[in-house]
Amino acid sequence: MLEAYRTHIAERAIQGIPPEPLSAEQTADLVELLKNPPTGEESTLIDLLRNRVPAGVDQAAYVKASFLSAITTGDVTSSLVSPVEATEILGTMLGGYNIEALIACLDNDDLAATAVTALSHTLLMFDAFHDVDEKAKNGNAYAMQVMQSWAAGEWFTSRKQLEDKITLTVF
């Protein structure tokens, strides 16, 4: 899988275009490599997981989120990705297949603070908003932190302030 993807990267570089993101099949192969990483490929595997799998609701994102979710629950282990790191990576997926796993992490004291940070900056919640709300109403302090963060608009206010002047060209 790694050699084939490296060949793909080289072919695209010759054309002056970036490589395509990993497909669901390539992501599944990557997951297997992450479970038993070949020596010397550790940083490449992590880079592919973090940066070459599409976020959101792509099938590759489903494979990625399922793998990371399984790490957070302890069903799967990887010497390269701890449960906290898995939660952090889930938080970079913007919304979609990662949401259910992040909400579940609110019930795990070891992962909840990381999940709060991730969910506080995630807007694409759809109906899962109600799951967080329900947890907060049932006394989950971490879910309450997420709700308070959303109410305060931290997803917006935590971003870098815009420049005083922005020059644009409109056609």
Cite the ranges covered by each PLM segment:
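Amphipathic alpha-helical packing elements
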Residues: 1-36
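Residues that form generic nucleotide/phosphate-binding pockets
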Residues: 8-12, 33, 48, 70, ...
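Amphipathic alpha-helical scaffolding segments comprising HEAT/armadillo-like alpha-solenoid repeats
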Residues: 24-31, 55-74, 93-106, 124-136, ...
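Structural detector for internal amphipathic alpha-helices that build alpha-solenoid repeat scaffolds
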Residues: 17-20, 42-58, 76, 80-95, ...
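Eukaryotic acidic, Ser/Thr-rich intrinsically disordered low-complexity regions
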Residues: 2-5, 133-171
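Structural signature of alpha-solenoid helical repeat scaffolds
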Residues: 37, 74, 78, 107-110, ...
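Exposed alpha-helical structural elements
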Residues: 4-8, 29, 44, 66-67, ...
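Short, structured secondary-structure boundary patches
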Residues: 39-44, 136-137
